Regions:
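Sec-dependent N-terminal signal peptides
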Residues: 4-13
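Boundary at the C-terminal end of the N-terminal hydrophobic targeting segment
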Residues: 17-19
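Short coil/linker segments at helix-helix boundaries
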Residues: 23-25, 31-41, 65-265
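Residue-level recognition of tetratricopeptide repeat
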Residues: 53-56
Length: 265
């Protein structure tokens, strides 16, 4: 799931970096100290004072997107996810080891994914409110800090996260250790599109009843699993039960098949 962060950052490296450092945007301090909830509050207050401040609105959208990732990571931590054993979307997010995990169930994972989609919708709605075509947001991404354990310990910076996912450091880290990126209006549209894509992937998964066989599919990823009592697994695709097909399938199209192919997002 973390691939959007990688692509958002790497694809934006082509944006020019200015020699003189302008004042840091409001959002950056909260992204660096990991106090995303406080950052949302501060950004909303700034927008109350100046509703046309699209830099603050852009920063709020980024905070909300990053917070969505952190909330997903905290849920994965709660259930003791071993991300290196996962190939499925959303389960590959590296989180600290939890020695006392809760038991995961099909319904519990569904609630986690629904919450993630709701968080993404909030971020997308914020970004949709940006009207200034010349909006800029200059951020040093390296020190964006996640608290996946929810304890204040074992904090993970974005660079540490990217290094784990990449299997090593990126070449640009030597020349740009702060990972300075200047986002513009095109990145607003880009991030909105990714929020839509990830939400659609969640909807695609939730549109199909896959409770039977859930325990087999996540064994090795979660240490404690509650099986689906009384549900036999049907491996025949024609036996899949579509949930609320009239409402969901026209929206998500073929996104379930992307999930079935285990796209590494």
């Amino acid at each position: 799931m973390i691939r959007p962060l990688i692509l958002l950052a790497v694809c934006s490296l082509a944006v020019p970096i200015y020699a003189a450092d302008p004042p840091s945007p409001l959002a950056e301090r909260f992204l660096h100290n990991g106090k995303f909830a406080d950052g949302e509050t501060a950004s909303l207050l700034a927008l109350d004072a100046n509703p046309t401040d699209d830099e603050a609105r852009f920063g709020l959208g980024v905070i909300q997107f990053v917070r969505a990732v952190e909330n997903l990571g905290q849920a994965m931590y709660e259930y003791g996810a071993v991300s290196e054993n996962a190939t499925q979307p959303f389960l590959r997010l590296p989180v600290p080891k939890n020695r006392q995990p809760s038991a995961i169930s099909y319904k519990a994972l569904g609630r986690v994914l629904d919450a993630f989609a709701a968080d993404l919708s909030r971020a997308e709605a914020t970004l949709a409110g940006i009207k200034n075509n010349k909006v800029k947001l200059r951020l040093r991404l390296a020190k964006i800090t996640f608290d996946f354990s929810g304890t204040g310990n074992d904090r993970t910076t974005l660079f540490e996260l990217l290094t784990k996912l990449n299997g090593g450091r990126f070449d640009f880290q030597k020349a740009d250790p702060d990972f300075r990126v200047h986002f513009d209006r095109g990145d607003v549209a880009w991030l909105r599109a990714y929020c839509h894509l990830l939400s659609a992937m969640v909807e695609g998964y939730r549109a199909v009843d896959e409770e039977a066989g859930f325990e087999r599919r996540v064994t090795g990823i979660f240490p404690k699993i509650e099986g689906a009592a009384g549900k036999a697994e049907d491996i025949n695709w024609q036996g899949l039960k579509v949930v609320d097909a009239r409402e969901r399938f026209p929206i998500v199209g073929g996104m379930y098949f992307l999930l079935a192919s285990e796209i590494a997002v």
